[in-house]
Structure formats: C-alpha cells, structure tokens
Amino acid sequence: MNYSLFISCSKGLEYLLEDELKGLGLHVTQVSPQGVYGEASLPVIYNLCLWSRLANRIQLILFSGHAAKEQAVHQLCTDFHWQTVFTHDKTIAIEFHGASEQIRNTMFGAQIVKDGIVDHFRRLNGSRPSVDKEKPQILIHAHLKNDILTVSFDLVGYSLHQRGYRKKAGKAPLKENVAAAMLLRAKWPELAAQGYGLHDPFCGSGTLVIEAAMMAAHIAPGLLRQDQSLQYWARHQSSLWEKLRTQALQQVKPLAVKLVGTDADGKIITLARSNAERAGVLPLVEFNTLPLNACRPGTKKGLVVCNPPYGERLGEVTQLVPLYQQLGTTLHTCYQGWQAAILTSSPVLAKALGLRADKQYTLYNGPLECKLYCLTLSAANKLKNTPNAPLSDNAQMLFNRLEKNRNHLQKWARKNQITCYRIYDADLPEYAYAIDIYNDYAVLQEYAPPASIPVHKAEKRSLEMLQVVPRALGIHPEKLIVKQRKQQKGSEQYQKIGKTSQRLIVTEGKAKLIVNLYDYLDTGLFLDHRLMRLKFAQLEPGTRFLNCFCYTASASVHAALAGALTTNVDLSKTYLLWAEDNFRLNDIDLSKHQFLQYDCKEWMKITRDKFDVIFLDPPSFSNSKRMSDILDIQRDHVSLINMAMRLLNPNGVLYFSTNLRQFKLEPMLKEKYAVQDITPQTIDQDFKRNSKIHHCFKIVMPHFADN
C-alpha cells in the first residue's frame, strides 16, 4: 500500500530535497517552494523519517475537500475515519494555516478541526482524545487555501532539523538541515569518500562539523531520537521500524581523518564538544579554541565550510570586512588544494574575501536570504581586495581628497577643542558618503544610490571606500561604522537599528557629550548645529533657556555650563534619559533643570512659562503614534513659531532651525516679527562644502529689534 505524503523544507531547498527523497525511494509527484509531494510505501516512509537530512516535516495526507465555511470544515473532519490514524486515548494538537472569507483566524480554524475530531470519536465510542498543545502524541496539520481544506498527520511530530543533539546554541545558530544543505552543495559526501578533511573556522556550537561527521560516517540523523509520533500511528509496524533502525546502525562506518572545528570563543567550543558527544560523533571530530589567523590545515586536501558572522544590523557589515579579508588571506595562503564553501547574506562581505567563487547557491538561514559561495583554492584563484592592495585610479582620487581634508580639519578641530566633525561629504559624487570623525572612530553614512546605478558598481564603490578610509584617515578598520543615509519618513525619524549600548564620550568646547555610534541612524549629536550650541555656551548666568524637540539636549548642556536654567521638552523618554546623562557627565545639578516628556506642540499650547532664549529645532516630518497630529515643518512652522514667540519674555530671542533642504519661510512671519536669516553664521568649517545642511533664523519681537 502506498501513502500520499507532503515533506516540507526550508525555502530554497526544495529541489535538493527532491533529489534526496528520490534516493530514499519516494515517488515524487510535485515540487513546490514549500516542499515535495509524493507517494511511498511504509518501509520508504520509515526510511524518510530516519535518513532525511533536509526535510522539516513529513506529513501523511489524510484527506482534502471543499470547505469555504465553518460547517463544511467541521463536517469534513467529523466524517473522516480518525480511528484509522489513532485511538481516542491519544493526546492531540492542531496546527491550522490559511483562511477563507468566514474563517480568518487560525486559532478559530484549529478549534473547528479539533471539534470535528472530538465529535467523530464521541459518536464512535463515547470517548474523546485530550488536547495537549505542548507535547501532543498526534499532531494534525490543516491547511485551507482557495476554499480547499487539506488535513495531514505529522508522522514525526517535530521538525526533523531538531536532531536531538543540540541542547544549546551560540548567538546565531544555523539550522541542522540548512547546514546539511551547505554540505551537500559543497559535494561533501563525495569529498569525504575520497578521504578529504574538513575544517570550520567559525564552528560556534559545532553544527556544520557534526552534520559533516554524520554524513561521512553514514549516521542516519533520525537515529538520535526515539520520540517520533509514528509510534502512536494506528498503522505503525514496530517490528519493521526496529528492523530499519538496526539496518541504519549497521551502516555506520569509521572515518580516516578527524573533522575539525575551531572558534575564537572558548566557551562555545565547550558547547560544541557537548553537542558532538550527544550526537555520538565526538571520536570523529576535534574542536579547538583558535583565532582565524592561526588556522592551518591538518590534511593536504579538504573542505573549509563555514557560516561566518554577516552582520544584519546597520554598521556591522563594515565592521566585518577585515574579518572576511583575513578569511580570504588565510584560505589563499594556507589552504591551497582545498575546497571552500562560505555562507553569507552580504555581497559586500563576499567580495571582501577577494577570491573567485566557482558556484553560488541561494539558501535561507531562517528568513534571511543568503548565498553559499563555493570556491576552489588554487594558485589560479588569485587574491584580490587585500587591505594593502593597490588602489584604483578613482580610489586614489578619494584617498587624496580625504588626506587633504584631514590635514586641514585636524588642525582646526584641535585648536577649537573639537573631537567630532565632518571630514567628507560626497566631495566626489561617485563616492556618495558623509564621513564623520568621533574621537578615533569614523562613521560612514552612505547616501542611498540612485536606482540607475548598477548594484555591482555600488558594491565596488563601497569596498573601495572601506579600503581607502583607514589608510587616508589613520582609522583602525574595526573603528569604522557604516550606515545608509536616506530620506527619513515618519516613524523612521531617529530610527533605531540595534542595541549595543556602546557609548562614546566626545568633546565640544567646554562640554563633554555622549554619542552612540551603533544603535541609531543618528548618533545623538547633530554636528552641523555646533556653532548654535557654542552660541548658547555664551549665555548669561540665570538665562531661562527652552530647548524644544531637545533630542539629547546637547545644546542645553552648553547653556547650562554657562549658568542658564534650562527646560528640555521631547516626546522620547529614551532621549530625555540620554539628555540627563549628558548633564550628569558635565557635573550639572539636575535640580535646576527640567526634562519634560511631552508632545512639544501640545506643551507649548498649555505652558505659562516664559523664557529668555528658545531653541526650536523640530524634525522635518513626524507621524509618531504618540503625537496628537502629524508634524510637517513646511506646513506647520508658522504655528510652531507663533506658539514659541508667545513664550518669550519681551526682550527674548527665538532661534528656529530646520534641516529641510527646500524649506521656505512664510513671508508673513517677517511682517509680524523681526526675522534674520543667520544660516551662514551657523555653518562651521567642516560643513562649508554643504551650506544647505540646515536653515537657521533669529526671531525677535519688532520693538526689541529696533533697540
């Protein structure tokens, strides 16, 4: 008797899975992006459960039928002969996927299927199975699409990637079946048969090395667990199952060479050894604590296979370029005659290897699309893109410009007690970056390239930028941070891109300020407003200073150091806490200053306080959910300025600033107030190349201007 099956897999593995399943005896009827459909006898089903290295779940298709409505789903599930699958004393759980016009909630769909099963057994013998959502003996899958319900029984009960040997993993674990796919794409079974060695220099918890050992030693991955759901299946033949398990055990063979995993993290190596012991391959493998640059081959020929870090947070990719360059250098220098297979999601990092790939395969590490680069390490595969490689003509022009800017701006910065400044701002259009110096760090903000620029050209420019900046500016490669600067919209204002809590203290005149170069697109300090901040550093003691949309209140720090009494208003609690930290860093008594978490527009409407100096620097646009209304600075600047002017003492001054490049001040404001465009006076030396970085206006009441 043959059974209809659906075997699911990770995205991108369906055709590799098809080949594997055919080799195990499945008659394939259809391949889809979600997996493979086929027919198989009971012995073949058991072998699939024991031997598949790529599958996620093996589902026995029970029935399908038209079911647009709740009643139809219930009827199909009530009518099916469930006693042919399991008995009433088993525990069950339902996983429901899909929807119809009437069934839009998967929990509701699962409830209908469960009710149908329960009603069937009650009619049959008056008893019913119990529900156990955590660890059911019988897991039923129901899928509703285009008003067709398909119901299946999960023969194993869990995803087959859960081999049972990995109790703990590192920070970025690789699924066992994705690791197996990497090895199959790299032709590891064939290489192992020829006596090749294997080395994973980023082994983490050992998944790749363990999977490679199981393949080479012909160990069936399904042997490691004995809690498969098929033992509760009504048609299970335990004698046949045990016979096939015994045959699988008899096929295990010894290895001629040990497979090696190394990692710079000693703690993770201990975990890898424990995992290998649980997998039963500890005698076949060797795990050592070793940095990448110390890795050396133990055999003349072999396969280097690895899943290095590839940084999905903004800024991390660039941090990893030196690591990939070192990997390329180590492979080229020490592993001649070997093969290599390297998984990464970043084309920039792949190019940083400096080695030519023979083949590329798309794989998915979870939801993340990656490429597996397969290489032959030979003299013919010459190393490129090394840190000291000769510069192209364009890259040399960039080097010259950066060196010129550095020589000019470093002297100016030292003279003015400034440790953070802009050194480059797309001076050469083909290298569309802004580069800011923060102490001995460089933050590279890449302007999003136009769609007309081919991807390969943009990637080439990125690599050249990373090659040139450390040389020209004397910055260590590990202290380069890259972000992509694009037009910010709505909730993207001050976009958070990660969490490292890595803070750096910089100096600006008499003030010390905290910046975070990693976790946000912006660093906590708008460098272009430096001259405005230094202007506030000259306020008279006792001046009442309002900083609206205060961000991290760096302007207020300067004012407070001069003796001003500051009020700081912002909607973000995160930035207000950061502002308080800035004050503490400068030994400023917080009791003399206010930090108010408010929508600035609403606060200015209700406050009765008066101020001598107001700094109003709103975002160009914001639609934060916590705001009462959308903020559009071109549309709303008149009302904001009017509200701020109401809060001024008779002789007070409002400084209004915006970074909206195309900003136009409403002419009627000049009729109502004395308005002076002071933008040129607020552009410091490092922003002279980009005089439209912001607009700044000094606004006072007309009678005060006459005085």
From Swiss-Prot:
The keyword S-adenosyl-L-methionine applies. The keyword rRNA processing applies. Signal peptide: none annotated. GO terms for cellular component: cytoplasm. Keywords: Cytoplasm, Methyltransferase, RNA-binding, rRNA processing, S-adenosyl-L-methionine, Transferase. One of its GO terms (molecular function) is 23S rRNA (guanine(2445)-N(2))-methyltransferase activity. It catalyses: guanosine(2445) in 23S rRNA + S-adenosyl-L-methionine = N(2)-methylguanosine(2445) in 23S rRNA + S-adenosyl-L-homocysteine + H(+); guanosine(2069) in 23S rRNA + S-adenosyl-L-methionine = N(2)-methylguanosine(2069) in 23S rRNA + S-adenosyl-L-homocysteine + H(+). It is an enzyme of class 2 (transferase). Residues 44-155 form the THUMP domain. SMART domains: THUMP. It holds the Pfam family RlmL_1st. It is found in: Cytoplasm. CDD domains: AdoMet_MTases, THUMP_AdoMetMT. Its main location: cytoplasm. InterPro entries: 23SrRNA_methyltr_KL, DNA_methylase_N6_adenine_CS, RlmKL-like_Mtase, RlmKL-like_Mtase_CS, RlmL_1st, SAM-dep_methyl-trfase, SAM-dependent_MTases_sf, THUMP_dom. Its EC number is 2.1.1.173, 2.1.1.264. Belongs to the methyltransferase superfamily. RlmKL family. Specifically methylates the guanine in position 2445 (m2G2445) and the guanine in position 2069 (m7G2069) of 23S rRNA. This is Ribosomal RNA large subunit methyltransferase K/L. The gene is rlmL.
